[in-house]
Design a protein with these regions (language model features):
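A glycine-rich dinucleotide-binding beta-alpha-beta segment and adjacent secondary-structure elements
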Residues: 127, 300-377
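A conserved FAD-binding loop/helix module that cradles the flavin
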Residues: 156, 160-166, 171, 375-401
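An anion/pyrophosphate-binding glycine-rich loop and adjacent beta-alpha core
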Residues: 37-39, 53-60, 91, 174-177, ...
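Glycine-rich FAD pyrophosphate-binding loop
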Residues: 24-48
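N-terminal Rossmann-like FAD-binding beta1-loop-alpha1 element of flavoenzymes
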Residues: 5-32, 395-400
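Glycine-rich active-site loop/strand segments that organize a redox cofactor
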Residues: 48-94
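Short hydrophobic core segments
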Residues: 8-10, 33, 131, 144, ...
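A conserved short coil-to-beta-strand element within the FAD-binding core of flavoproteins
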Residues: 127-141
Length: 401
């Protein structure tokens, strides 16, 4: 192969733009073919418009099919990804739970530096070019054909778009059908009566069904109660782990063991019942007893989950059930909610059919796949964008060789 390596990147999203810059930096002649009128539009929607770039701690266990991409994740760590963006001039800040954002708190800043990176590395960006076919050329290379009749030739092709799975299927790759993940969950709403709009921090355990004794996954974070069920980042994470019939158990007192909870509520009962008897000549009711524990509406929901009414007078015999409800508030999952707003889709080409470091196809040498093209999805908190950047860096550098 004489002269510069010709690389065509199919898709001008997060992973595609990074792949293009890295390939161009390595000396390749790079063209990006984007079907939309502008590149990087999905980047602008990430992180509620703030763009959660990556996470300070990324492990293969954070991903579906993480074992298939372990070498890549080790090579292209958060430090290396942030180094790439630092070279493009982006400033960042780290927030709670390791989430890393641009210092500007604006996703358009990230897209701006990626566009600039393409410009300064002479990447030829062509929008309105929907690729419909990739054909092998003889003796080597590929012909990339667009819906509008345009065609391009390349020594290497990087498929960096979710729509590229059809292209990979035509090349013989195994495709897992797409389905939404990282979205709210519909649940049985009876236990959630009166909680719509309330936020509460909890340790959430997911069980595959009502009979399971060991959780499939455990997460801690803020839960948002909705009229259809549960939302919030911790619930988005759980949507990757559970299906219909699963049970979510919310522990509103994760910092206390069951024994410590028993002690807390017993001491509170002794103190409050003595005061109520002396002042009012009666026992406190459960609304009075739960005051100060959680949000008022969460207090009432816990009492009802324990099998009581908030207006009932509290007795010592009630306390174990109150503790059990506070540390094991249960809601059965009935499905996914707001799937049209899902942050990520699960599915794509099997990553096991690609090199675990370079992402070159094991079936079609010279073809690479990145980002959402592959059946890899991660937790909330910057993990999915990290995969986009890291996979783009890996494929771009490898394709230029």
């Amino acid at each position: 192969m004489g002269g510069r390596v010709r690389v065509v990147v199919v898709g001008g999203g997060a992973s595609g733009l990074v792949a293009a810059i890295c390939a161009a930096r390595a000396g390749a002649d790079v063209t990006v073919l984007e079907g939309a009128s502008r590149v990087g539009q999905k980047i602008l929607k990430t992180g509620n418009g703030r763009c959660n770039l990556t996470n300070a701690r990324v492990e293969p266990a954070d991903y579906r099919n993480g074992a298939a991409i372990m070498p890549l994740l080790e090579e292209f760590s958060p430090t290396r990804v942030l180094g790439f963006f630092g070279e493009l001039g982006l400033l960042v800040s780290e927030e709670e739970e390791g989430r890393i954002y641009p210092l500007s708190n604006a996703a358009n800043t990230v897209l701006d530096v990626l566009r600039a990176g393409c410009k300064w590395h002479a990447v030829d960006v062509r929008c309105g070019q929907k690729v419909v076919e990739i054909a092998r050329m003889q003796p080597d290379g590929y012909r990339i054909i667009c819906a509008n009749g345009n065609d391009f030739s390349a020594d290497r092709v990087i498929i960096a778009t979710g729509g590229g799975t059809d292209l990979l299927a035509s090349l013989g790759h195994t495709i897992e059908p797409f389905s939404p993940v990282l979205c709210p969950l519909k649940t049985d709403t009876r236990p959630l009566k009166g909680l719509t709009g309330v936020r509460a921090r909890a340790r959430v355990s997911a069980f595959v069904d009502e009979d399971a004794t060991e959780p499939r996954a455990v997460r801690y974070g803020e839960v948002l109660f909705r009229d259809y069920g549960l939302s919030g980042i911790v619930i988005f994470d759980m949507s990757r782990e559970v299906g219909d019939g699963a049970v979510l158990s919310l522990d509103f007192l994760p910092q206390l063991s069951p024994g410590q909870c028993d002690g807390y509520f017993s001491a509170k009962y002794a103190s409050l019942s003595a005061s109520a008897s002396e002042l009012f000549g009666r026992a406190p009711n459960l609304t009075e007893f739960m005051c100060g524990c959680f949000h008022t509406r969460v207090n009432d929901a816990v009492v009802r989950a324990a099998g009581f009414k908030p207006s009932e007078s509290v007795t010592p015999e009630m306390l174990p059930r109150i503790v059990a409800a506070a540390k094991g508030f249960r809601a059965q999952v009935t499905g996914l909610a707001e799937t049209g707003q899902a942050q990520v889709t699960r599915g794509g080409a099997s990553p096991w059919e690609f090199d675990s470091l370079t992402l070159e196809s094991r079936l079609r040498p010279g073809v690479y796949a990145t980002g959402e093209t592959l059946d890899v999805d991660g937790r909330c908190g910057g993990f999915n964008l990290h995969w986009a950047w890291a996979s783009g860096m890996a494929a771009g550098a490898a394709a230029a060789k």
